[in-house]
């Protein structure tokens, strides 16, 4: 418990320095002390760490285990419908159930996948054989997780940007999800570079993530912190890096204010890449260099795992970039939390036909194994199909 409480910081009355136009690194400790000196000690007392503190640390470490990553299968029913439509299937509960059954029941999936993010329908759903999806995952030593945000809505007063809703009622929902078997949670918000990002949008994203993280930990769920920096735009990799630095500085400022235990969280950042419409592309080595520099400058080593999103990269590109980041030791477990970059070829292979289930599962396992090797820094790229090289960027993508 001592190590868990080491990162439990007292809430500070100082507002975000970056929002005020100043560098987070220039904050003067003396000013904080001066403000605190006028406040009664009892007013500064924060609530004790979550009763689940030890379990949170254990869950986070289990997910962030060598050679393992997360399979994101938490698409909303509407987004799942788009995936099904791409192979000529209607968006019905039966079809969604059939596809999700294919994913969770792939034999040996737990060799490479340590966690699976589910949509709420899936958390309470059974497979086509009548077994609970959660139980099937647990049998494969895969930790069930749950998407808890309620999606993006326009952020009034911003540069046509968005904010993520879902804090209302979150405490009761996360408690219920824990009882249903979930042990970690995900909240996705986005930052758009072509539209700014405005200080308002970054602050709103960071504050929402911090409140969600604190509430999730209080319910026993390890929060995945995901401020996705969208690939949309023609900007270069340096612009992405600058924005990412500001976003993560803001996120950790508010995580600390909300007394979030860093040893009991996981991060799901975007890799630092040029905009999808930029003329200059980056090599895996360049992506790794910029991304690792960002992590070293902004992410405390107390965080156990960094599970990258693919963000519309091709299956092959996402794996190559991850492999490049694991060519030298890192203070965190650097891995993956992929959806399309794990499932795209699998979905096409299945095509909604029962006779194709095994072939589709074999494709899924091959893709999961490739990323497992990349997490270990041992991926070679041999034997990849042309489909794995196809980009999946969608402008203005919604999840």
From Swiss-Prot:
Keyword Plastid: yes
Phosphoserine modified-residue sites: 158, 216
Predominant location: plastid
Single GO cellular component term: apoplast
Keyword Chloroplast tagged: yes
UniProt site (Necessary for preference for fructose 1,6-bisphosphate over fructose 1-phosphate): 399
Keyword annotations of the record: Chloroplast, Glutathionylation, Glycolysis, Lyase, Methylation, Phosphoprotein, Plastid, Schiff base, Transit peptide
Listed pathway(s): Carbohydrate degradation; glycolysis; D-glyceraldehyde 3-phosphate and glycerone phosphate from D-glucose: step 4/4
Induction summary: By sucrose. Induced by drought stress.
Transit peptide: 1-48
Catalytic activity: beta-D-fructose 1,6-bisphosphate = D-glyceraldehyde 3-phosphate + dihydroxyacetone phosphate
EC numbers: 4.1.2.13
UniProt xrefs under SUPFAM superfamilies: Aldolase
Modification comment: Can be trimethylated at Lys-395 by LSMT-L, but the trimethylation has no effect in vitro on the kinetic properties of the enzyme.
Record CDD domains: FBP_aldolase_I_a
Coiled-coil regions, chain positions: none
Assembly with partners or alone: Homotetramer.
This protein's name: Fructose-bisphosphate aldolase 1, chloroplastic
Gene from which the chain derives: FBA1
């Amino acid at each position: 418990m001592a190590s868990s409480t080491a990162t439990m910081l007292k809430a500070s009355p100082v507002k975000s320095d970056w929002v005020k136009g100043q560098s987070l690194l220039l904050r003067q400790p003396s000013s904080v002390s001066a403000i605190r000196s006028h406040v009664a000690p009892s007013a500064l007392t924060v609530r004790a760490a979550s009763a689940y503190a030890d379990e949170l640390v254990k869950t986070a470490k289990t997910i962030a285990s060598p050679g393992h990553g997360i399979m994101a299968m938490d698409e909303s029913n509407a987004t799942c419908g788009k995936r099904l439509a791409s192979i000529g299937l209607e968006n019905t509960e039966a079809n969604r159930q059939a596809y999700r059954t294919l994913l969770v029941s792939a034999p040996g999936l737990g060799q490479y996948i340590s966690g699976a993010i589910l949509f709420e329908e899936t958390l309470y759903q059974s497979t086509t054989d009548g077994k609970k999806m959660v139980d099937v995952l647990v049998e494969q030593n895969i930790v069930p997780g749950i998407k808890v945000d309620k999606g993006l809505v326009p952020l009034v007063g911003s540069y046509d940007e968005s904010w993520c809703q879902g804090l209302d009622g979150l405490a009761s929902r996360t408690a219920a999800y824990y009882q249903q078997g979930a042990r970690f949670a995900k909240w996705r918000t986005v930052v758009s570079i072509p539209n700014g990002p405005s200080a308002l949008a970054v602050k709103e994203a960071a504050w929402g993530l911090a409140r969600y993280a604190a509430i999730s930990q209080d319910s026993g769920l390890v929060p995945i912190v995901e401020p996705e920096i969208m690939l949309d735009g023609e900007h270069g990799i340096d612009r992405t890096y600058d924005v990412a630095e500001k976003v993560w500085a803001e996120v950790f400022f508010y995580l600390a204010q909300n007394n979030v235990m860093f040893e009991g969280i996981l991060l799901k950042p975007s890799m630092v890449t040029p905009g999808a419409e930029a003329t200059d592309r980056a090599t895996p080595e360049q992506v790794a260099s910029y991304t690792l520099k960002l992590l070293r400058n902004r992410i405390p080593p107390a965080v156990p795992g960094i599970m990258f999103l693919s963000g519309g990269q091709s299956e092959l590109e996402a794996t190559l970039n991850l492999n490049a980041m694991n060519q030298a030791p890192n203070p965190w477990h650097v891995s993956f939390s992929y959806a399309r970059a794990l499932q795209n070829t699998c979905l096409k292979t299945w095509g909604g036909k029962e006779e194709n289930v095994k072939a589709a599962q074999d494709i899924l396992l091959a893709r999961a194994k490739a990323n497992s090797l990349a997490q270990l820094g041992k991926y070679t790229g041999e034997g990849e199909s042309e489909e794995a090289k196809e980009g999946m960027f969608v402008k203005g993508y919604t999840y």
